[in-house]
Amino acid sequence: LNEDDRQELALRGIELAPSGMERMGVELQNLYAALAQPTEGLTVSYPVTDVSGSELRPAFVVERLRKLFPDLQMERESSGKEYRLTALGPALETAGQRRNSTLWQYFRQDPDTARRLDAMEYAAAARRGSLSPAAVRVVYGQRISMTASRLERIRSCHFAYFMEYGLRAKPREPAAFDAPQIGTFLHYLLENVTRDVLAQGGFAAVDNDRLHGLVRQYIDQYAAQELHNFQNRNARFQYLFRRLRNTAYAVIDQVAEELRHSDFIPMAFELSFGGKNGTLPAVTISQPDGELRVGGKVDRVDGWIRDDKLYLRVVDYKSGKKKFDLANVRMGLDIQMLLYLFALQKEGKRYFGREIEPAGVLYLPARDEILSMERNVTPEALEKEREKTLKRSGLLLGEPQVLQAMEHEALTEPHYLPLRVNRSGDLSGSIASAAQLGRLGNYVDRLLRQISAELHSGNIDADPCCHSEEDSQCRFCDWASACHFRDGQDRDHLRYILPVKPEEFWQELEEGGGEPWQN
């Protein structure tokens, strides 16, 4: 709104937030009050970047002060850093950056600070080894319990896992506001709306009007339970929540449309493994050196019965753009859904009452994709592009009957499953035979045994996974200041996630006997 618009609305009695000029007046008053307080001196500073690293311009008052006092020199943090000498801790850090400097020699003369310099020299010369068996028991315990999501953390980098879950170190929090818990909100809606729809006969029996009524009901319920004093929140927060609400309608509409064309039905939500209240027992790996227990929760489990066997698929809601990738699986990453699937195969009978056959895993995009298209795009082209965003990502049992039960048009024109049908009618995509899934289950089991052995042996190597040096997790790691990673120094090394074709992946599993892949 420009100023004329605001004046017109104000004349009509509509209350608006303060205008830009009004806010400027308040800021100037606050600024005047702050500048009038000092009695001896005044230091004015400003950030050059925000918490994400984006460049920031100084506030106008900085330029005003420079014009009022042209003889003042601008000091940068990197020039001199004399202010760091006013406190002992920062001064010692500065001395440690250049051994044998004047500052280093100064602190050498004092017995107390000399001991600190000795400790710094010892730490600088130390090499990252392994934890002793006694240290492992103190840090992790004889029986190590972890969630499935932590498995990916330890496979990404042993040292990062040790810092976060062994030492329980906490990174310095940036001065920024937390983003809204979009994933939690969408999980809540998907679970509760789907459960109510199933109680009313399934998505085929519930039209869109009734479906949207349920969505509204649970949005209001969520706002009342989780967003206290929602009506008193500022206008921007309410706007963002309304926009998220529109996303929720779009996501649930496409989930409903998929399940209307499927014989698989949701059978469990937030199904838990392990813990005191777990529906199913934790996945347990027992070895001579100790035990590893892995628990967690499955967002959704869908099932279909054939020949008295229950075919199950594990569904994970993702508000981001995560894709299932066999290259990651080979490295021990992205195995969370597979772990749950094979655990259900072994333990699911006690919960579902039938023999279990694994039917696959799927990431479901819990987001409303915004398309970037030309202004004169045709409705047909727009629909074709939107269909691409509905494709799930995952790995499915490649039996035609099972795929057709998942999506009735799977063998001719699949819309949701990660499948392709060529002009000759041949089916391809992210599929595997029952034998291949069996070998994959053995591979996941061996990975867990390897992780258990590494934990109990005290492995804390800095060995981050990456596709290239440019995307190494070290660039954004919370523990970089404690790690000092240097590729090739001692046991520090990058582990590259190399691309792999599906046929190569399955061949490696068959020829390697299920041994975890190393690089």
Report each predicted region and the residues it spans.
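Acidic beta-strand-to-loop metal/phosphate-binding motif
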Residues: 43-47
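Short glycine-/polar-rich loops that comprise or flank the Walker A/P-loop
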Residues: 38-42, 356-359
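Structural signature of nuclease core domains in nucleic-acid processing machines
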Residues: 1, 26, 52-53, 59, ...
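Conserved helicase C-terminal RecA-like lobe
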Residues: 1-37, 325-326
